[in-house]
Each structure stands twice: as C-alpha cells, then as structure tokens.
C-alpha cells in the first residue's frame, strides 16, 4: 500500500475507473454474444440486438476502451453475420 496521500487517492480512483471499464466491456461482450446467438438462430429480434451491440461498441470506443479500428472490425463482422 502507498504511504503518500496522493498515491492512496490514485489507487482509489484507478480502482473505480477499472470497475467502470470492466462494466462497460462486459456489457459490450454480452450484447455481442446475444446478437450472435440470435443471428445463428435466425431470430426476429436480431436487428434490435444488432443496434444494441453497435451502441455498446461505439460507447466502448468513445470511452477509449477499444480502438477505432477494433470497433469497426467488430461492427463489420456483426453486419456480415446478419446478412448470412
């Protein structure tokens, strides 16, 4: 554990940020998996789930959790999966 007051505060803030980031990434992965299951089963709500997945991916990109190319690649793969 750090002894310096500012270092202790940095530990607290970094733990909070890590929890926020973990939550965002988990939500993104969950929505992607839900869409993939719906797409493979030709479910009727696949378009809704695709929009949700796009939203989660864009949010993760805007928060700096994933890079722009990574987000684009994920979205492209999901769109390709829907078209098949």
Swiss-Prot record:
Keyword terms of this UniProt record: Ribonucleoprotein, Ribosomal protein, RNA-binding, rRNA-binding
Gene3D superfamilies on file: Ribosomal protein S20
CC terms in the record's Gene Ontology section: cytosol; small ribosomal subunit
Pfam families, per the entry: Ribosomal_S20p (PF01649)
UniProt keyword annotation of Ribosomal protein present: yes
Region: Disordered, residue numbers: 1-25
Keyword Zinc part of the UniProt annotation: no
GO molecular function: small ribosomal subunit rRNA binding; structural constituent of ribosome
Single GO BP term: translation
InterPro entries cross-referenced by the UniProt entry: Ribosomal_bS20 (IPR002583), Ribosomal_bS20_sf (IPR036510)
PANTHER family per the UniProt record, alphabetical: 30S RIBOSOMAL PROTEIN S20, SMALL RIBOSOMAL SUBUNIT PROTEIN BS20C
Function of the protein: Binds directly to 16S ribosomal RNA.
Family under the similarity heading: Belongs to the bacterial ribosomal protein bS20 family.
Record-given protein name: Small ribosomal subunit protein bS20
Source organism phylogeny: Bacteria, Bacillati, Bacillota, Bacilli, Lactobacillales
Underlying gene: rpsT
